[in-house]
Every structure is written in C-alpha cells, then in structure tokens.
Design a protein with these regions (language model features):
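Active-site core of glycosidic bond-cleaving carbohydrate-active enzymes
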Residues: 1-140, 151
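Surface beta-strand/loop "capping" patches
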Residues: 142-170
Length: 170
C-alpha cells in the first residue's frame, strides 16, 4: 500500500485484527522478501510489522504470536521475537504446554479465550527459536541473528541449516 505494507491484494490492506497473517507470508515462511535484500525490502518488512502492531491483537490466537516471532526474527529483532514467544507461552498454552488457541490467562492479548488444541502454534514457537539462533534461508548461514540482550549465555548444538549442514555455536 502507500505506506509500504504488504496487502492481501491491491486495494485490500490489513486493517482489521485477524489471526492469520497470510498477507505477510512473503516475509515468513516463504522468504520472498528478505531483510538482506536491501532498503526497499527492509522498509516493506518494517511497515508490515508496524501495521500488525498498530491494528493490534484483538483477534489473534496463540499461533499469531508464534508467527510474529518468526517474522521479527527475520527482521533481526530479537527483543520483539522473544516478547512474542513469551506471550505465546504465558498466555496461550496450557500447563502441559499444549497450545489452546485462545488467551488462557485473559490478559487482553486476544479477545479469544476458547481452548481448541492445535499444534501449529507449538511448531511455529520452535521454529521461532531456531530463527533467533540460526538462519540460512538466503543461502548464508547467520548464527545468533536475533538474540535479545537478556540472553547472555546462548549456545546450541546440531541445528540443521539449509544445504544439509549441522551447526553448533556458543
């Protein structure tokens, strides 16, 4: 759109809170628009993420936060990615760690408070952590690309990078 945000289609901007960010799939998971592509792509990514924040999470579900974490990690925003994952874990998961879609704590992070169990939120959560630790979707392996300041002692072993590489780092 005129502000640089991704839209659903020409003339159909993201203007109402919704649990799916299908208009932003080019950022994640597809990686068709990537931070490393330069200023124009960075502007699109920043504007799209800003719009998500501005419209707000009224009708998001837990996996919306997991997906947001992946997109924030792709934008090298470790603080934002960590906050989204924290919200997912604290507000949208049951004590057994199952994702229950709705805000189980009624914290105001979503108007949905229902409990349908779905796995995609948990899978996206795990993917978000990996995106924070290791990215390789562009053909370049980046280690610790989106680590928040509070993660002072970070390491991982045998994460899989594109090209069948196993990577470990401290």
């Amino acid at each position: 759109d005129e502000e640089g945000c991704l839209t659903f289609a020409k003339g159909y901007p993201y203007k109402e809170s919704h649990r799916h960010f299908s208009h932003a799939m080019a950022i994640h998971p597809l990686g068709l628009i990537d931070w490393s592509d330069g200023e124009k792509s960075q502007h699109i990514i920043r504007a799209t993420l800003k719009r998500l924040d501005e419209v707000g999470p009224d009708y998001w579900t837990g996996y919306s936060y997991s997906w947001l974490a992946n997109m924030k990690a792709r934008a090298f925003d470790g603080e934002g990615a960590a906050q989204a994952l924290k919200t997912f874990a604290e507000c949208f998961c049951l004590k057994n760690t199952f994702h229950a879609n709705g805000d189980q704590t009624q914290s105001g992070k979503s108007r949905f408070t229902y409990r349908p169990f779905t796995l995609e939120g948990n899978f996206a959560f795990a993917a978000g952590i990996q995106e924070m630790l290791l990215q390789s979707h562009t053909g370049v392996i980046r280690i610790f690309p989106a680590i928040p300041k509070e993660w002072k002692d970070v390491s991982f072993e045998s994460l899989r990078a594109m090209g069948e590489f196993l990577v470990s780092a401290r």
